[in-house]
């Protein structure tokens, strides 16, 4: 149901991938889910709660992701600063997987059914001092696939350091601490827990900000093991038998932990973004040859208090999700009254 995600846990070996999927076009353009950047972007703070700041008071953001075929995701977020207690935010995220034709084990039609996930995110961010901040998000998620329903409750926690000049930002984040409960079944699954770290650095005399993330610190081996080809020495498309050295496997595995991106700021109005995810490329490639899976790019425009972002993240050779985000601050409208 969810083959789109290739970042949390070993591919094909976890449930609730929906908890990891960002709706932020800015984050998607840079190839990351949690950006370490302190510039008041609410869409970023939803995924990295330690990035909430007082300047987000009355900020609101809308996002839509057009995925494959009829699959889509929408998100709306609102934040409010309460002074010393910190910044609180509420987010609603909806994943629609479309309408399906149902059949039983005898190939008899059982009618049509919908599949969807709905997540309500409640977030809190607090500045410890001028440089350090902390945040936490609660993410209850209701899932319904035909007659199957489940409820997951997961938490994200992050801590960030922001240099006084704001050119250097670092974040450590723990995501998806929780469990999923299935209605009508005596079954409980753990949500896909992840510990990651990320940093960004803006050059002092050039309009570039670089991003780097080290993901899945709780698990070294991120290579997918095919039960029908456990040694992974046979290409499933060409049938070619290959053998890799231990050194090659080490660097392959190490590369799967690394995400990289760069943002170009043109006159504080236009933003160009590029990202690369080696693991996504390795898991989604159709053959041993080069392909664009794992590459992402995006565009941002900031005009008269509104910020629009678009991104495209290449998960597959033929299709890729398109991300759209519109952000503003309601304060600018209130002041005009």
Task: Label each residue range with its predicted role.
Residues 7-337:
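Subset of outer-membrane beta-barrel
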């Amino acid at each position: 149901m969810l083959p789109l995600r290739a970042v949390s846990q070993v591919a094909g070996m976890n449930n609730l991938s929906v908890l990891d999927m960002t709706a932020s076009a800015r984050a998607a353009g840079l190839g990351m889910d949690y950006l370490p950047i302190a510039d008041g972007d609410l869409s970023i703070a939803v995924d990295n709660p330690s990035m909430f700041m007082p300047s987000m008071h009355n900020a609101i953001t809308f996002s839509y992701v057009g995925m494959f075929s009829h699959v889509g995701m929408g998100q709306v977020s609102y934040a409010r600063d309460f002074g010393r207690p910190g910044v609180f935010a509420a987010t609603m995220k909806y994943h629609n997987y479309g309408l399906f034709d149902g059949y039983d084990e005898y190939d008899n039609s059982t009618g049509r059914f919908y599949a969807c996930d709905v997540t309500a995110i409640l977030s809190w961010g607090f500045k410890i001092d001028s440089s350090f901040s902390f945040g936490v998000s609660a993410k209850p998620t209701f899932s319904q696939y035909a007659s199957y329903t489940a409820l997951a409750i997961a938490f994200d926690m992050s801590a960030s350091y922001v240099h006084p000049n704001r050119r250097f930002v670092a974040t450590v984040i723990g995501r998806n601490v929780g469990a999923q409960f299935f209605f009508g079944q005596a079954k409980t699954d753990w949500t896909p827990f992840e510990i990651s770290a990320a940093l960004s650095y803006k050059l002092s005399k050039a309009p570039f900000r670089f991003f780097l993330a080290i993901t899945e610190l709780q698990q070294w081996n991120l290579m997918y093991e095919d039960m029908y080809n456990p040694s992974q020495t046979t290409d499933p498309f060409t049938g070619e038998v290959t053998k890799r050295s231990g050194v090659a496997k080490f660097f392959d595995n190490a590369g799967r932990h690394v995400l990289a991106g760069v943002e170009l700021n043109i006159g504080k109005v236009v933003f160009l973004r590029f990202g690369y995810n080696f693991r996504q490329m390795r898991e989604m490639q159709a053959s041993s040859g080069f392909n664009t899976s794992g590459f992402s790019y995006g565009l941002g425009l900031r005009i008269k208090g509104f910020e629009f972002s678009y991104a495209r993240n290449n998960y597959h050779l033929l299709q890729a999700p398109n991300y759209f985000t519109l952000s503003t601050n309601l304060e600018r409208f209130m002041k005009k009254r």
